[in-house]
Amino acid sequence: MDTSSYIFWDMSPDMFSLGPITIRWYGVFFALSFLCGLYLMTKVFEHEKKPEDDINYLFYYMIAGTVIGARLGHCFFYEPDYYLAHPAEIIKVWHGGLASHGGVLGILTAVYFYSRSRPEQSLAWVLDRITLPAMLGAGLIRLGNLFNSEIIGIPTDVSWAFIFARVDLLPRHPVQLYESIVYFLIFGFLMLAYWKWDWGKQRGLLLGTILTSVFSARFLLEFFKTRQADYGHDLPLSVGQWLSIPAVIIGVLLIFQSVKQAQLEKTS
């Protein structure tokens, strides 16, 4: 096979080293996602005249929920046999292994506990607004996956295929880039929806939009990925696709309910 026409990807996952300390690209993108998220939520709280001191508390809840949820999601959604046999490995986040579906569940749990401590900021109110930083963060983290040469696509002969030198010499779909681009586009749409179209006033509309769009895209893009779970290879759909279906259904229901509520308010 002539591979000269494809993109040869041999990027080191390490950004640089300072003595015994190594800074990895994935870690930089992960940290950047939270810093950008903190900035965005600060602007949202200023816009809606909420206590700025609450931003730090929400930030801590979000970090804990994202990391714990994403880690547990990877361990039990994708490699349950291994981690049940080696439970001590679960806490070794630095070895890699985070799942976006688990991250979503972790964020939902974290926001639930945060909103209970802030009665004036309901669960629905917070969830609608964290869609903005969540979507930007998702796009950045997928770039981190690209630098790690992980979550790779299936072999292909398309002209833009990547050869991940740290994996093999097969041209593959750069599915990390596909997802990242889609997530950045959804982020741009949500920014318009919140700042220009004022969708934040319709409870559940932003959250429903992100669940429907993100997990519909995720369902479709899974067809271009190699299977990540250590089971279910004989099933027609991947684990990621099965997990995406309920998220899409919930998103559609939230959009329907939000639009219906807005229509009732107009007629009342």
Curated annotation (Swiss-Prot):
Enzyme superclass (EC): transferase
Biological role stated in the UniProt entry: Catalyzes the transfer of the diacylglyceryl group from phosphatidylglycerol to the sulfhydryl group of the N-terminal cysteine of a prolipoprotein, the first step in the formation of mature lipoproteins.
Cellular localisation: Cell inner membrane
Pathway membership: Protein modification; lipoprotein biosynthesis (diacylglyceryl transfer)
Pfam families: LGT (PF01790)
Membrane topology: Multi-pass membrane protein
BP GO terms, sorted: lipoprotein biosynthetic process
UniProt keywords, alphabetically: Cell inner membrane, Cell membrane, Membrane, Transferase, Transmembrane, Transmembrane helix
Family: Belongs to the Lgt family.
Protein EC: 2.5.1.145
Matches recorded under HAMAP family: Lgt (MF_01147)
Protein name in UniProt: Phosphatidylglycerol--prolipoprotein diacylglyceryl transferase
Primary site of residence: membrane
Cellular compartments per GO CC: plasma membrane
Domain of life: Bacteria
Gene encoding the protein: lgt
UniProt: a 1,2-diacyl-sn-glycero-3-phospho-(1'-sn-glycerol) binding residues: 142
Membrane-spanning residues: 25-45, 57-77, 93-113, 151-171, 175-195, 204-224, 236-256
GO molecular function, one term: phosphatidylglycerol-prolipoprotein diacylglyceryl transferase activity
